Structure formats: C-alpha cells, structure tokens
C-alpha cells in the first residue's frame, strides 16, 4: 500500500480568493449569529432530598471451608469401602479395563482435569466413555452443559449419586410395560438423538487387587434387604459397621 501525503506548495490565485471569501463569511456569521441569548430568570427550586438507604442487617452468606472438607472426606471414605473406586488411573487405562465388559459396567476414578475430583467411566453401546462428576456447594452431580444443569440431580456424596442412577437403570430394564412408539423428531433433533450416547449404569467393576471382605459382602446383602438398619436386633458394634457404608453397591 502506498500512502500519499500532499506536500507544501504555493496556492494558486483562485484558491487564495476562495479562502479569503470563506474566511469573511465565517467572520460575518460569527458577528451576527453567534451572540449569547439572554437567559430568563427562573425561580430556584430546592433540590430533592433522598434518604440514604439503610444498611441491611443480613450479611452475605459465606461457605465454611470445613464443610467442604468434611463432605469430600466422607465421599473418599465411602469410595474406598465400595471396592469399585480405582483411584488415579488414566482414561486409557479405564478404557482397557472396560473394553471387554458388558454394557452398563462402570467404575469411578480420579479426574485428570484440575477443576474436577472424580470421573465416571462406563461401558456404553458405543464403547467406554467418561463423564466428569462436578462438585459444588457440598453436592455432587454429573457434569452437563449450562442449559441442562438445573435439571441434573445433586447428591451429598458420589456413592449416593451412582446408586441413584443404578437403581433407575435397573428399574427401567426390568420393566415389562410396553412403551408407545416415539413421535417422529425434526431433522435437527434427529441428528442430535443419533449422536447422543445413552448411559446405563448396571454393575460396578471391582478392583482386581482388592477382594471385598466377607463382612462387606454381608453388609451389602443387609442393605439390599432393608433401609432401617437401626431397627435390627444387632450388637452396637455391628450396627456401627453397617452405618459406615449404607449403600447397596
């Protein structure tokens, strides 16, 4: 690009005449038009007085960090007792463990993303996939987009979250009621439905290097039979052991 800048040169006679005439017109307009107008006197009105807002007595609520620490520590304790928490394995390792498993087999591992604590790895009809588990306000939920997040259920710990979806998937698979044929979808929604991956949580994949104890297996069996453990005629020590892991998985 070439930038052209006009240099200094003598003005022609016609240009000088035009500039002088324009200057005279501007001065004439200034003398006749640009005159200050008299301002009429108006009675002064008192400025309105506004009452200062009273400070609100309720201080903004701040979360106690100790509450988050207790919630996360309790979740880690439950996961270690579960037998299907695989710790700090990578996504590739989780894929290898789930590749030959039936659909619905899952495990929980540490997330490699710095903003998340845990990740759910599950075998789907298209192969193993991973879903991050989000933590906020002492609650855990499956990670989702911004629009779907208000409809995602939140739970006080990860094992409660997993057990909820396992129970719902098991109930759906055992249901024998025929479903009506779905209505045809628009082209855009049909493409989204085809691209979507359906998750089924049916059975956890236990660690091969950690065989569950007979006590833990009995505890699972009792939890599957009743949710009112405190009413069972058991010794206090055994009742406390059952309360340490009140889940069915």
UniProtKB/Swiss-Prot annotation:
**Cited CDD domains:** SH2_CIS, SOCS_CIS1
Q: Where is the SOCS box domain positioned along the sequence?
A: 200-248
Q: Name one Pfam family in it.
A: SOCS_box
Q: Where is this region: Disordered?
A: 41-64
Against InterPro entries, the record matches this protein to: CIS_SH2, SH2, SH2_dom_sf, SOCS_box, SOCS_box-like_dom_sf
In its UniProt record, a GO molecular function of this protein is:
cytokine receptor binding
Entry's Gene3D superfamilies? SH2 domain (3.30.505.10), SOCS box (1.10.750.20)
Every copy of the SH2 domain together lies at 84-165
Q: Does the keyword Hydrolase apply?
A: no
Q: In which pathway does it act?
A: Protein modification; protein ubiquitination
Q: One of this protein's GO BP terms?
A: cytokine-mediated signaling pathway
Name the UniProt key words of this record, in alphabetical order.
Growth regulation, SH2 domain, Signal transduction inhibitor, Ubl conjugation pathway
Ribosomal protein in keyword set: no
Q: What does this protein do?
A: SOCS family proteins form part of a classical negative feedback system that regulates cytokine signal transduction. CIS is involved in the negative regulation of cytokines that signal through the JAK-STAT5 pathway such as erythropoietin, prolactin and interleukin 3 (IL3) receptor. Inhibits STAT5 trans-activation by suppressing its tyrosine phosphorylation. May be a substrate-recognition component of a SCF-like ECS (Elongin BC-CUL2/5-SOCS-box protein) E3 ubiquitin-protein ligase complex which mediates the ubiquitination and subsequent proteasomal degradation of target proteins.
Free-text domain note: The SOCS box domain mediates the interaction with the Elongin BC complex, an adapter module in different E3 ubiquitin ligase complexes.
Q: What is this protein called?
A: Cytokine-inducible SH2-containing protein
Underlying gene:
CISH
